[in-house]
């Protein structure tokens, strides 16, 4: 794309879960007459509604959203797929003389779109099998501690209980002799003019919002939604490569259905695991992306962000 074609900046609003990204994006999209690109790896699935905190039907009618309800559980859609498709849609939005606002918190979706994925090596089955056997024998904590020593930045972005990315990170180190973090430093320069704003929110306030959101999800029917998924997609739950059903909020309820925990404990774990996820998101954003952090709340939040990051004339 030539510089002459890059007429419009692309505003990117990111932040931890429950930080108010979607509401702010709706406000800004209204000011810009923009379309929203959802960078959320769960909202793209039709079946994951309450637990993924999708925009309301009213919001979807008022502002055009991309990558909401476009896939069904079981359809593969990687971060690379998202980056390629989102890039093409942003170009289309610009060609229609409109703005695009990217909003979300899925770290790999955002990094793929904003920076492009580098040339990571293909998998090595022998190495992967050995690491998987070591995981089964020694447990994930030992492997996670190894990664923390070799690549602390990558380790800080991972959930120690989710082992697929842990094994892949160690596999890449063995294949290349380099860490994932160092390999990612050589990615292509983005072809679009991204203006990245992160929503800053005090940790106690964020955690309070997370607890409130979980309670509201339960009251809105999360248990029933999870039970439907559990019954209809039971076989997929046993598939290691299907990560959509391993989402926080659903996985804990699946354990409740299987009598591995009681209901109150499941809800407590949803809140705890969501807080852990928010912490990993913040670590990722601060280590991997060039973000301008701004106050998430207040009546002037939307115009302040427009003025500072994107479209000063539209903030007046």
UniProtKB/Swiss-Prot annotation:
The keyword Transmembrane does not apply. ATP binds at residues 15-22. Residues 40-43 are annotated as: Interaction with substrate tRNA. Substrate binds at residues 17-22. GO terms for biological process: tRNA modification. The record marks 106, 128 as: Interaction with substrate tRNA. The keyword Glycoprotein does not apply. It is an enzyme of class 2 (transferase). One of its GO terms (molecular function) is ATP binding. Keywords: ATP-binding, Magnesium, Nucleotide-binding, Transferase, tRNA processing. Its cofactor is Mg(2+). It holds the Pfam family IPPT. Its EC number is 2.5.1.75. It catalyses: adenosine(37) in tRNA + dimethylallyl diphosphate = N(6)-dimethylallyladenosine(37) in tRNA + diphosphate. Belongs to the IPP transferase family. Monomer. Catalyzes the transfer of a dimethylallyl group onto the adenine at position 37 in tRNAs that read codons beginning with uridine, leading to the formation of N6-(dimethylallyl)adenosine (i(6)A). This is tRNA dimethylallyltransferase.
